[in-house]
């Protein structure tokens, strides 16, 4: 399991860059003199780059040494993140964020795809929970630290993050084992793995359910900083500190999620968690004070930490021989959802000037996603019953 903690570190730096824009968005909006709906494109550009290139990264990584792919991806991530720190304009920032997303698309799928290979089958969910905890830790520590660094200048968080990523790159190059494909013959086409996956009936349903969830999730998450700045008049460092409990909840949830799912069952835990998250997101703008908002942050992302590894487990169960492709597909769905969700949320927020329009949109998408996961669960039970009767 020691190797999993190395993945934890990679997910921490990638996650910090992914989530960093939420507390910085009000500051960068003023810096580049853009409206609320346009400011969301600094988040969407990263997500779009990731979503587009994740489709290529998965099949390629299934034919190459995953360590090599991860190192080159991380090198590109370091350069593009540094360039974000010197972006002279809104357009340049969006371009460099797009490049950072492209680079990250070649890193994180290697983590999700490698975990089932390097740990025992009984430890897969736990391993994914630890990797997910890296994302949660980036919210708990990376966001407030980024907010604190941004109190000096908005450039600083990007410079520090690229320096930390460089150190991690050197460590990975020295100690990370090579993970070569189990099948030595390369597939003739990048398209073929996706054709094979989508020939399975459950692939499209799982993909759509996850896309809807992440569209709703990032619609609200991306504008939390803007909302806290507008309604509670918090500074960028205060926004980062306010999000400390958000990351704490996510990390704790990801660490105990495997125990909860063992007791309640995977799909029961997943569906119940989505229902709770939807209710909490919807209620956020109506809480009367910041203390209750903080409590809502904790509970919402504690639940998210529990259910996210389960979603990854559902994805990885589709086709064990194409884990890299599946991991890229799931990440592409997440960042496509981020692009769509952030764009729609920016429009809703700008039009209504009320965060409740955004969280209401999130709640509706969670209900739709939950319905699809229920369909997947029922189909799986019917298939299990049919096999038992044969």
Swiss-Prot record:
Listed GO MF terms: transmembrane transporter activity
Domain of life: Bacteria
Main localization category: membrane
GO terms for cellular component: membrane; plasma membrane
Swiss-Prot/TrEMBL keywords: Cell membrane, Membrane, Transmembrane, Transmembrane helix, Transport
Membrane spanning residue stretches: 4-24, 40-60, 68-88, 98-118, 130-150, 159-179, 205-225, 236-256, 273-293, 295-315, 329-349, 356-376
Cell compartment(s), UniProt: Cell membrane
Membrane topology note: Multi-pass membrane protein
Record-linked PANTHER family: CHLORAMPHENICOL EFFLUX PUMP RV0191, PURINE EFFLUX PUMP PBUE
Family: Belongs to the major facilitator superfamily.
Listed name of the protein: Uncharacterized MFS-type transporter YceJ
Gene: yceJ
């Amino acid at each position: 399991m020691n190797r999993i903690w190395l993945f934890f570190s990679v997910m921490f730096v990638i996650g910090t860059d992914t989530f960093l824009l939420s507390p910085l968005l009000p500051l960068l909006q003023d810096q580049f003199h853009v409206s609320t709906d346009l400011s969301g494109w600094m988040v969407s550009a990263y997500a779009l780059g990731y979503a587009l290139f994740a489709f290529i990264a998965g099949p390629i990584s299934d034919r190459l040494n995953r360590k090599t792919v991860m190192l080159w991806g991380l090198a590109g991530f370091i350069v593009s993140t540094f360039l974000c720190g010197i972006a002279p304009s809104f357009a340049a920032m969006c371009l460099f964020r797009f490049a950072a997303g492209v680079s990250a698309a070649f890193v994180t799928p290697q983590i999700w795809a490698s975990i089932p290979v390097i740990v025992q089958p009984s430890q897969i969910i736990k391993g994914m929970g630890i990797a997910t905890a890296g994302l949660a830790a980036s919210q708990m520590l990376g966001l407030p630290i980024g907010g604190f660094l941004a109190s000096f200048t908005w450039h600083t968080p990007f410079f520090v993050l690229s320096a930390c990523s460089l150190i991690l790159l050197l460590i990975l190059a020295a100690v990370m084992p090579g993970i070569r494909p189990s099948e030595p013959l390369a597939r003739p086409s990048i398209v073929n793995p996706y054709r094979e996956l989508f020939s399975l009936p459950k692939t499209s349903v799982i993909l759509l359910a996850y896309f809807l969830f992440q569209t709703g999730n990032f619609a609200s998450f991306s504008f939390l900083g803007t909302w806290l700045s507008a309604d509670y008049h918090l500074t960028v460092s205060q926004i980062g500190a306010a999000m400390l409990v958000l990351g704490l909840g996510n990390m704790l949830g990801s660490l105990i999620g495997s125990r909860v799912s063992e007791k309640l069952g995977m799909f029961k835990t997943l569906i119940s968690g989505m229902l709770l998250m939807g209710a909490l997101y919807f209620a956020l703008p109506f809480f009367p004070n910041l203390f209750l908002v903080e409590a809502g942050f904790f509970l919402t992302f504690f639940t998210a930490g529990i259910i996210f590894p389960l979603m990854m487990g559902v994805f990885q169960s589709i086709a064990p021989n194409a884990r890299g492709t599946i991991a890229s597909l799931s990440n592409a769905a997440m960042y496509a959802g981020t692009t769509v969700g952030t764009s729609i949320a920016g429009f809703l927020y700008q039009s209504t000037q009320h965060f409740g329009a955004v969280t209401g949109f999130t709640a509706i998408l969670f209900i739709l996603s939950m319905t699809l996961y229920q369909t997947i669960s029922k189909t799986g039970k019917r298939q299990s019953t049919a096999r038992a009767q044969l």
